[in-house]
């Protein structure tokens, strides 16, 4: 039977080998890609917007037949009125405008023109 000192030395060697094996196992596991979290996928691009088709829109609407028939003519007339309003605004007399629009909150003639142009851009 081996002495107690020999058993302690054998036990210490086995313990050291187990600890080394444990550290080796941990380092090998850390290097495996299966242990790492999965990579974040790239963001998906938003779906492309469908181009506006006016004829398709008019088919889906529940407007009266007369309105469906004449809407393009009315839209052209409205565009003409807006463009003539802009041209008229360019040729407008400043003194006459300010006299007719006293109390409407316009600071200057240029202020009124800029507000009107902003309004036309919105609508």
Curated annotation (Swiss-Prot):
Gene Ontology cellular-component annotations: host cell membrane; membrane; virion component
Keyword Transmembrane helix attached: yes
Biased composition (Pro residues): 35-47
Transmembrane segments: 5-25
Induction (record text): Expressed in the late phase of the viral replicative cycle.
Keywords: Host membrane, Late protein, Membrane, Transmembrane, Transmembrane helix, Virion
UniProt similarity note: Belongs to the asfivirus CP123L family.
Protein's UniProt name: Uncharacterized protein CP123L
Provenance organism: African swine fever virus (isolate Tick/Malawi/Lil 20-1/1983) (ASFV)
